[in-house]
Amino acid sequence: MLIASLKKYVKSIALAAAWVLTCSHAVADEFVALSKITVYVTVDWEGVSLDNDNLETIQEFRKKYPHIAMLQLITPSYWVRPDVDKSATTAQIKSTFLPIDQVGLHLHGWKSLLNYCQVPYQNSPSFADQDEACEAGDCGYSVSLENAYSEADLSKLVACSSEILVSEGFAKPIHFRAGGWQLGAKLTSALQANGFTWDSSRIDANLLTTNWHEDSGMIKMLKVLHADSTPLDQPYYLDQLHEYPNNAALADYTSSKQIVGMFNSLIQQQKTVMVLGFHQETAMNYLGRLDVAIPKMEAAAKAANVELIWASYH
């Protein structure tokens, strides 16, 4: 009788343990399934040119990936040069957009833009070690905004540039990336003074050494501006500005294999945000790298039981 009771007792304990184990596995599985990573695809419009080859490359990419929204970061110099057809320029730019996209501001120190905004043009220092003095044509692309201009002049430039985008039918921008990732305290203050809430100018300079020499102005300046940046950086508050580090750089500097590798590293380290992108002006040459990487990223996320979310803005 006693033995039968003990057997019954042990059996009940075993059943209870099995139930607890099953529930714990279910909770664990649910936890893993809830792991997420959000990927931001950004486009830097450099203000150089609007060549059909690049625009058509982007258009084809959008047809292939209509579910991926893009943050379109535009330098307004396209509209301020002599004899420009503003409406045609706007139409060309919008020809690459989808309704799910968001427009933000990207700034390079073009002389045409500085003159339009009535900010005294500075021709140095250059992150590309170039002579940015010119009497005719346009120049200033590689002038470091942070290092060349005062906070007051930067605030005036940001305000004026935002107004240009609004005048062309875009919403007032609140997203930003500095040309050459040249963001420091002065430009940060200028952005906040003009209502910007989101920036993606922080980057690990080592991600750019495929194109820039260690002794170049670009690498040296970025190692000062973003001294402790790494590819694992995650969003944080920079005063009132929400900083989203460009932790995967742009496709000009990273191969498809590297993009996927960085994505896997972020997953393995349980990071939740990846910011990558490309330049409009070089889309024909480098957008294909994202085209190759995206299916591999989606497959890697699925294999790791991680939900891949393509960032949305609406």
Predicted features, each with a name:
Residues 83-158:
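Substrate-binding cleft of extracellular glycoside hydrolase catalytic domains
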Residues 46-54, 75-89, 111-115, 177-186, ...:
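Acidic-and-aromatic substrate-binding clefts and catalytic sites of carbohydrate-active enzymes
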Residues 175-272:
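Active-site-adjacent pocket scaffolds in enzyme catalytic domains
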Residues 2-14:
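Bacterial N-terminal signal peptides that target proteins for export
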Residues 62-70, 135-184, 266-277:
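CE4/NodB-like, metal-dependent polysaccharide N-deacetylase domain
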Residues 29-102, 111, 172-173, 275-276, ...:
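Active-site beta->alpha N-cap acidic-glycine motif
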Residues 13-22:
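Bacterial N-terminal signal peptides
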